[in-house]
């Protein structure tokens, strides 16, 4: 999968590269990303390490891809399948501020999920997000992930408080 490249309308999902680090540093400092996906990246060396961790798929438990604009190659965000084990996985994503509200995350999640079902033979992919993160709920719904329930106070987010989370999932057998 080292040379994996997926496409979705207007997007290319590709492996992370060292040159992505400068954009990652700027985007992960965005308050909306820090609120829901605090990464602790505060300087360029940390951003380079962050990119290298995501580019290293050797454990077999995750596949992380950069989301780029198909027209100009600009970095628009990231998406990953992680916790891959026994036919199950979780999916996560983030989008750059300039890419929000354009369906980037939904298109990426749909493409990466289809690849996971087809190429990895996954049966179930889960997606969870803070109940207050309405944008992520829309991504889940638009990508065919069904709401299964609420995980009470299940995760501490960037604000330091525990939040309830929505649990969504898609099965390979779902339409």
Predicted features by range, described:
Residues 94-95, 101-118, 134-142:
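Conserved acetyl-CoA-binding loop-helix of GNAT-fold acetyltransferases
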Residues 42, 65, 130-131, 154:
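Conserved beta-strand edge residues that scaffold enzyme active sites
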Residues 77, 133, 144:
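Conserved phosphate-binding and hydrolysis motifs of nucleotide-dependent enzymes
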Residues 16, 126-128, 146-163:
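Conserved catalytic-core motifs of GNAT/GCN5-like acyltransferases
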Residues 1-98, 119, 161-175:
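GNAT-family acyltransferases
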Residues 140, 145, 168:
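Conserved active-site tyrosine of GNAT-family acetyltransferases
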